[in-house]
């Protein structure tokens, strides 16, 4: 089963490289198992929101910050594994 990961990031802030890095890390960890999409906001929002199958699992807007630590990455990977039924 393909798991959908959607990332909304601040396009006005130049966060696209952060999205690309996250996408690459997740594709390396879960090859051919994810459908990853990204959406840059046209204005400066400061957002970096990660949804797994429609469920918000990481939100910079709500205080999670960037995905810049192993524990933050693990939270996203755990949500993906749960969505896969692992």
Swiss-Prot record:
It comes from the Eukaryota. One of its GO terms (biological process) is response to selenium ion. The keyword Membrane does not apply. It holds the Pfam family Rdx. Keywords: Antioxidant, Cytoplasm, Redox-active center, Selenocysteine. There is a cross-link at residues 10-13 (Cysteinyl-selenocysteine (Cys-Sec)). The keyword Cytoplasm applies. GO terms for cellular component: cytosol. It is found in: Cytoplasm. GO terms for molecular function: antioxidant activity. Belongs to the SelWTH family. Selenoprotein W subfamily. Plays a role as a glutathione (GSH)-dependent antioxidant. May be involved in a redox-related process. May play a role in the myopathies of selenium deficiency. This is Selenoprotein W. It comes from Danio rerio (Zebrafish).
């Amino acid at each position: 089963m393909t798991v959908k990961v959607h990332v909304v990031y601040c396009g006005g802030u130049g966060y696209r490289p952060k999205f690309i890095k996250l996408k690459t890390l997740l594709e390396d960890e879960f090859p051919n198992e994810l459908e990853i999409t990204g959406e840059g906001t046209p204005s400066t929002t400061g957002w970096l929101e990660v949804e797994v199958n429609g469920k918000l699992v990481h939100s910079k807007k709500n205080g999670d910050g960037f995905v810049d630590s192993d524990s933050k990455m693990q939270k996203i990977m755990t949500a993906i594994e749960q969505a896969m039924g692992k």
